[in-house]
Swiss-Prot record:
PANTHER family: 60S RIBOSOMAL PROTEIN L11-RELATED. One of its GO terms (molecular function) is structural constituent of ribosome. This is Large ribosomal subunit protein uL5. This is one of the proteins that bind and probably mediate the attachment of the 5S RNA into the large ribosomal subunit, where it forms part of the central protuberance. In the 70S ribosome it contacts protein S13 of the 30S subunit (bridge B1b), connecting the 2 subunits; this bridge is implicated in subunit movement. Contacts the P site tRNA; the 5S rRNA and some of its associated proteins might help stabilize positioning of ribosome-bound tRNAs. The gene is rplE.
Amino acid sequence: MSRMKQKYNDIVPALREECGVQNTMQTPKLEKIVISVGAGEEGRDSKLIANMADTISLIAGQKAVIVNAKKSVAGFKAREGAPSGIRVTLRGDNMYNFFDKLVSIALPRVKDFRGTPRKGFDGRGNYNFGLQEQLMFPEVEFDNIIKTHGMNITIVTSTEDDKQAFTLLEKLGMPFAKGRN
């Protein structure tokens, strides 16, 4: 059992009490984590797309999928079927391992890091935030990167309430910024 899953099992009683949940099955929990990268201008360069997919696969510990555009949009210079991004969905042990790595290793390595913004909740219990570059993860070697890129991380929880999702993530060790940002 991963360290973060064990931590979740340890905080369940306190979490149930704080969220006012009677039924054990209503206890908030992590369902999945989605890591996505938009290709943007790099979408035309197949070498760069492959490098980005390899980097995200290394970070996630699971093979990333290249997402293609569904239809052409002239304003974005996007063609139907052209690569538009990379995505990987983590569940189970991979999800807990990635979350542990994110909270305990990657985020503390960010220069001038003051916490993730509190305003990333979507009103349905999910949390979104972005990272500026991928170099904070220990698996990524600077020499193997063609171009640095950011990523969007979506943490999906089983609750529909933002306050319960915030409590869950805070108890799991997510470093939120102080104040109301």
